[in-house]
Amino acid sequence: MIKNLWFLRGLRKGIRTEKFPEENPVEIALWSTELIGEGNVECPVDAIVDGQWNFEKCIFCRKCTPSFAPKGNINIFRVRNNEPAFRKSFHLFPFDSGACGACNAELHNIASPQYDMTRFGIFFTNTPRHADAIVIMGGWTQGMKKALDLALDAMPGPKLVIALGSCASTGGIMGKGALENEKYDVIIGGCPPNPYTILSALEKARGD
C-alpha cells in the first residue's frame, strides 16, 4: 500500500530538475505533440484539410483518430521574429484574454523545479513595462480588448508578441484569436501546449 503513495515516493526521491534540452524529455504527454497521418477526417476546427495538419488550429480533441496520431515531436511552434538581445535575460508578461486556464497552468509549470525556466534566464514579470515579451492566452474577448491594447502599448522595444495555444492564435473552438495572426512574432501550438514545447519556443524566440 505504502509503495503506491506517490507523494511518499516523491519525498524519498526528491525534486530533480530535468536536463532538457541537453537530454530528451523525461516524460511527455503524447497528445500535445505533432500529429501525423493521412486522409480527410472530420475536424471541428478545420485543423486537418486535404490531409494536412495545422498545429495552430488543433485542439487535440482526438476526433481524427485513428487516421492521425501523435508521434512525440514537441516542436510545434512558429517563430517569425526572434530577438537575440534577450539571450541573457528574458522577462515574460502573461496575459489572459479569456482562456480556460489550461494554457495558464502549463505556462506556470515552466517555473516549477522540474523545468526551472530560470536556468535559461527566463523570468515572469507582473507589469508590461518591464516585459521583453507578452504571452497571450485565450481567444478574443470584448472585455479584454482595451486591457490588451494598453499592455502592448506599455511595453518598451524591442519586444515580442507570443500566442500560447490554439485559442490565442486562431480562436480554437471559441471564435477568433486574441490578435490578428500576423501580429504574433511567435505562435506556440497546443491545447494546451506542454512545458517542453513552451521552453523550446522561448529559446528559439531569442535566437538560441
Locate each region found by the language model:
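Ferredoxin-type iron-sulfur electron-transfer modules in oxidoreductases and energy-metabolism complexes
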Residues: D46, A154-G157, A205
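Flanking helices and flexible, charged tails adjoining ferredoxin-like Fe-S electron-transfer domains
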Residues: K3, F20-P21, P25-V26, F60-D132
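Short, intrinsically disordered, charge-biased short linear motifs at domain edges
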Residues: I28-T33, A47-V49, F86-F90, G177
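Cofactor-cradling patches in redox/metallo enzymes
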Residues: A105-L107, S112-Y115, G121-S200
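Catalytic cores of enzyme domains
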Residues: M1-F7, I15-T17, G189-D208
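Intrinsically disordered, low-complexity segments enriched in small residues
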Residues: F86-F93, S97-C100, C167-T170, K183-Y184, ...
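Iron-sulfur cluster-binding cysteine motifs and their immediate structural context
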Residues: L30, I36-R78
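Ferredoxin-type iron-sulfur electron-transfer modules and their immediate structural context
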Residues: M1-D46
